[in-house]
Amino acid sequence: MKRGLDFYAPWCAPCKAIEPHLMTTAQSVGIKVEKLNVEEKRHMFDKYGVRTVPTLILMDGESETARLSGKMNLESIKSFLGG
């Protein structure tokens, strides 16, 4: 089952900007997105080797299938999630 991991920080302006696009697109393609706050889930950032926010990781089961980092827009999110 595909799922998304959204690595973000509450102070990150690009993270805030993509949230509505990410959630709407994910819902439309049937992908559940788990939001992971750098300030609360540091161990998850280390586990997945995330060094910048925002970072989106697409998972199929326990395997990473794709990663997108840095500034994003609606089109890049749709392309990434297959929407």
Language-model-derived ranges and their functions:
Residues 31-34, 72:
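Charged, surface-exposed interaction regions in soluble eukaryotic proteins
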Residues 60-83:
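Non-catalytic, surface beta->alpha helical segment in thiol-disulfide oxidoreductase systems
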Residues 48-57:
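Structural micro-motif
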Residues 4-5, 33, 56:
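Hydrophobic beta-strand anchors of alpha/beta hydrolase catalytic cores
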Residues 1-10:
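Short active-site neighborhood of thiol/selenol oxidoreductases, capturing the structured segment around
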Residues 38-45:
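Structural microenvironment flanking redox-active thiols in thiol-disulfide oxidoreductases
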Residues 12-15, 56:
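The canonical Cys-X-X-Cys-His
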Residues 14-29:
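Typically the conserved alpha-helix immediately C-terminal to a functionally engaged Cys/Sec
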